[in-house]
Amino acid sequence: MILTIKPLQGKECNVQVTEDEKVSMVKELVSERLNIPANQQRLLYKGKALADEHRLSDYSIGPEAKLNLVVRPAGERSGMASSSSAVSGVWQTLSTVLAKHFSPADAAKVQEQLVKDYERSLRQLSLDDIERLAGRLLHPDSEGMDTSYMD
């Protein structure tokens, strides 16, 4: 099948792939066509970022689909980006584990639900919860520490 890749600013290109192709391979093909390093590419389909380890079929990407390409500046990984890459690494590891136990479609659904639950849990934390958690992490040996939030 042929996919159209459209950078936010620039000329689009077409790549020939199969639906079982991994996103990382699509990035390599785009790299060859547009001279944009794969590690600086972020592919989006219908507004959703595509993970390198997933296959196109995991996202129901079919023939004649159009992917948007966001190009990250070289050397962008610092500060907040490094912590988000650590979180991203957790999701990539989870994806690998889920792939061993579920079909690609089911693994994607399970991971999507886990991400939603995780984000919902973070939004529900109060400042007091965060303060207690930070205190516990910064002072793990403190005796009189309130640990009721960990139940």
From Swiss-Prot:
What is the protein's major site of localization? Answer: cytoplasm
Report which superkingdom the organism of origin falls in: Eukaryota
GO aspect biological process, one term: post-translational protein targeting to endoplasmic reticulum membrane
| SUPFAM superfamilies, alphabetized | Ubiquitin-like
Where is this gene product found? Cytoplasm, Cytosol
On whether Transferase is a keyword of this UniProt record, the answer is: no
Q: Molecular function (GO) terms listed?
A: protein-folding chaperone binding
A Pfam family that the UniProt record links to this protein? Tugs
Please give an example of a GO cellular component term from this record.
cytosol
Q: Keyword Ribonucleoprotein, does the record have it?
A: no
What are the entry keywords? Cytoplasm, Transport
The record ties this protein, via PROSITE patterns, to: UBIQUITIN_1, UBIQUITIN_2
Per the database record, which ranges form the Ubiquitin-like domain?
Answer: 1-76
Q: Which SMART domains match?
A: UBQ
Q: What does this protein do?
A: Component of the BAT3 complex, a multiprotein complex involved in the post-translational delivery of tail-anchored (TA) membrane proteins to the endoplasmic reticulum membrane. TA membrane proteins, also named type II transmembrane proteins, contain a single C-terminal transmembrane region.
Q: How does the annotation summarize its subunit structure?
A: Component of the BAT3 complex.
Q: What is this protein called?
A: Ubiquitin-like protein 4A-B
Supply the source organism for this entry.
Salmo salar
